[in-house]
């Protein structure tokens, strides 16, 4: 007898996030769906980023968190009123000089000076699409400081925004750190973690995407939280990271799956190579 296909394992269509995102997991979503435990109702992501895993998984509910208040503010605005958001973005995206350095840096300055949540959400998308390499980076004054990307063409992600808004009706977006987010999990949940990566030996240190360094001690603490959730609450936790001696050591006790993926962050095209990615599975 034929069994029905599980839609958590094989999403019919892959949906791209409306944001560019350094270290995004769009290429890893099929592998992750294959290791997520079945019959769980809620996916919890303490490091949601652009939301590629959320967009390409099929759970009843989502709890999606990040420590970047601009990102969570943007997601909540898109969720609540995508039509108004799109109409506000278009004049900025389609301005005659939108793809120039002068215009970009003027908008960046406006973003850094503004305290209006809606204005910041609109400019965040513009800066993301026109800035360098999908980076989201702030300086010590909490000012967005990603340089102009100087791309030949640009794209307004209206379809992606509308799909995100549709999918987001089953999601809650929270500005919280990973420890706070772990506390929200119950027996119906699976936790997926995509932390800022510890740099490879040849990399410059681009781990502090939200202006907060996520160092080796944070990496170790996250691993301990995953182990504690597994042993104390019988929760399943999945973590993706570079496949290195360090990550294999801190995730010791998990089941490992190794895959090769294209790097989505670099300072030069020569560094866009396939690297070994480790998926650590703490099965509850």
Q: What do the predicted segments below correspond to?
A:
Residues 188-279:
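Conserved acidic-Pro-Pro-aromatic motif
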Residues 53-59, 183-185, 246-253:
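Short loop/helix-cap segments at secondary-structure boundaries that form the rim of catalytic
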Residues 126, 279-282:
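Short, well-ordered beta-strand micro-motif
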Residues 46-47, 65, 174-176, 193, ...:
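Short His-Asn-centered micro-motif
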Residues 35-94:
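Conserved S-adenosyl-L-methionine
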Residues 2-28, 34, 81-207, 221-232:
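SAM-dependent nucleic-acid methyltransferase catalytic core
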Residues 47-52, 160, 241-245:
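Short, polar loop motifs at secondary-structure junctions
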């Amino acid at each position: 007898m034929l069994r029905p296909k599980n839609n958590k394992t094989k999403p019919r269509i892959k949906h791209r996030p409306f944001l560019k995102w350094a270290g995004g997991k769009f290429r890893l979503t099929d592998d992750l769906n294959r290791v997520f435990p079945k019959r769980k109702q809620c996916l919890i992501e303490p490091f949601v980023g652009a939301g590629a895993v959320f967009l390409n998984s099929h759970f009843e509910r989502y709890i999606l968190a990040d420590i970047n208040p601009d990102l969570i503010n943007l997601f909540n605005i898109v969720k609540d009123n995508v039509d108004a958001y799109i109409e506000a973005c278009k004049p900025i995206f389609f301005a005659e000089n939108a793809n120039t350095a002068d215009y970009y840096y003027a908008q960046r300055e406006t973003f850094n000076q503004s305290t209006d949540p809606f204005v910041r959400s609109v400019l965040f998308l513009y800066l993301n699409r026109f800035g360098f390499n999908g980076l989201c980076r702030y300086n010590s004054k909490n000012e967005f400081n990603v340089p102009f990307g100087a791309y030949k063409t640009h794209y307004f992600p209206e379809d992606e925004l509308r799909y995100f808004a549709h999918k987001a009706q089953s999601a809650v977006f929270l500005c919280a750190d990973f420890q706070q987010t772990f506390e929200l999990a119950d027996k119906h949940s699976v936790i997926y973690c995509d932390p800022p990566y510890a740099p490879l030996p040849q990399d410059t240190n681009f781990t502090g995407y939200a202006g907060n360094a996520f160092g080796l001690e944070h990496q170790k603490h996250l691993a301990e939280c995953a182990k504690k959730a597994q042993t104390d609450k019988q929760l399943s936790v999945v973590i993706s990271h570079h496949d290195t001696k360090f990550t294999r050591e801190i995730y010791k006790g998990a089941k490992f799956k190794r895959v090769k993926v294209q790097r989505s962050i670099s300072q030069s095209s020569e560094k866009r190579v396939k690297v070994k990615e480790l998926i650590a599975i703490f099965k509850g």
